[in-house]
């Protein structure tokens, strides 16, 4: 891409994506209200009008309104732009310009950059040895099937009404994203401000913290290294600059890092999947936010799956979801060259099928009018070679860019699509009779069942939500041996919206029960108070846990959907490391359960609801 074009698009993506990456909660605070008379500079106001106002004064699709950004602290904005996930987009801005913009946006003078002081709550005893046979939740979906089913949670369904907070921990200067990984008495957590921490899973005290150099948001995985390695166990994760990291799981020391995609708008949002000495990495992007700029040569990103040697970080193979390279196909109204095909981002963790030696992913939409057969699809890759063995596209020609409301304007596709990604991981389940079924949840609000023995042929489908850019099935569902439990987001739109949770039989798609999301009750007030049920669900024997955008985490009976327990995670609470803090919206990663403790982040309010910065641990009676 030409340097001049890259400079131009930097301005656009700064405007659109500042929403996604400046939503960083004030360090260890509950409610951060902007000053009534902000110390605004004229330069900051001018920068905002030039680069941000077009999106945040008229938010559509996934662009949040300005008032959410105003809740951030100035330090958060400065650090994100200088040393965090917005560093590339803010390229070319001076330190003084960044400071001026932060003052204008927040009404506060920036203080020191965000740092995490691990000594504040340092564990006094020696850390427990890592035991991969201990009770655990390792990675995104608990198992290689991505079932999100914990068969041995250490919590009985009948005891769930007695769950109470055992400890609470405040994310340092960031809203709570990601999902906790539990290995015995160790808890590993990614922090969007650009940190990874290791805590004691029983108490929340800190063993270590490290900074990989970019924002991180997905779950991590832990694996054993061969004898003679620099460490005994490695912790694996990807960051928002498309770099995969391996660090010593005992100390946090970097072992290796590998950049898996050179496109300057690429990122890793899904958790890499670890199996033996292979790490399978999904790659996604920011590029679909390019629609408003007619000077940007849109679009050239293609989603990919990358296999790495888990011991060394060496690339074994890389396979693109959109297999044809982008080529010039027309010029837009400004005379800017446009390219296609593009898109097919992989937003979530891959799923491994050892029987067939395949890896399954769900893909996102196309970005241009040049369609691809592997967008909005379930795609099966050969786990040895990376070759695509089959794909089933359920929504063709879903050509979508954020902010496109007028077809053909700027880079907007002439025939815009509905943005019906497969944003969550596929789930492979084996029925009691031995038959295997591959499940996929789509933002259209449709739950799909595919036949892995017949190149992904559709076995059944069930429409359980109205769907949309932020609707339908968003982050993930959970499945036990016979049933699948599916949260539906549907945050905004018509009266047909159906936020809630539905149980279906895996064998045939028959609906067992449906529970609408209760009326929203937000501890922060009525602003952005909605009952969208978009976060990933988690199931244990007898109960399924699912959160809503109003901050409520609930347990439902797997038998009939009866609500067994309801806790407001957004309410103020004393933390073990930073005084009183609030949570917020439950979105993104779901709860994890291991060794009798239920863990959840609270405060992923980037696109819906409200931000917060809590990690909560629940046990029976809080003991």
Q: Where are the model-predicted features located?
A:
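Extracytoplasmic electron-transfer domains, predominantly the class I c-type cytochrome c fold
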Residues: 36, 54, 63-110, 278, ...
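Detector for the c-type heme attachment site
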Residues: 49, 53-61, 82, 106, ...
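Short, solvent-exposed loop/turn elements at domain surfaces
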Residues: 62-64, 144-150, 174-178, 197, ...
